[in-house]
Amino acid sequence: MARYFRRRKFCRFTAENVTEIDYKDIVTLKNYVTESGKIVPSRITGTRAKYQRQLARAIKRARYLALLPYTDLHNK
């Protein structure tokens, strides 16, 4: 059986010395939302708890202001 290389998880916000996550930064927020619109948990992304809380708050604000969708497009 082949072993797969697992990349070490790290917090991108800590590495870049981000003080606060902005809800208007849609490009960054989209990286932490799934196609179905769910917030990706920190155990998958490697984000620290402090930034995960800020991230969740920013995503929820962006959704409320219609900058991010709550769900994906429902094409029929």
From Swiss-Prot:
GO terms of biological process kind: translation
GO molecular function terms attached to this record: small ribosomal subunit rRNA binding; structural constituent of ribosome
Keywords: Ribonucleoprotein, Ribosomal protein, RNA-binding, rRNA-binding
Superkingdom of this protein's organism: Bacteria
GO cellular component: cytosolic small ribosomal subunit
Function as written in the Swiss-Prot or TrEMBL entry: Binds as a heterodimer with protein bS6 to the central domain of the 16S rRNA, where it helps stabilize the platform of the 30S subunit.
Family in the record: Belongs to the bacterial ribosomal protein bS18 family.
UniProt-listed NCBIfam families: S18 (TIGR00165)
Self-association state and partner proteins as the record states: Part of the 30S ribosomal subunit. Forms a tight heterodimer with protein bS6.
Full protein name: Small ribosomal subunit protein bS18
Organism name: Aeromonas salmonicida (strain A449)
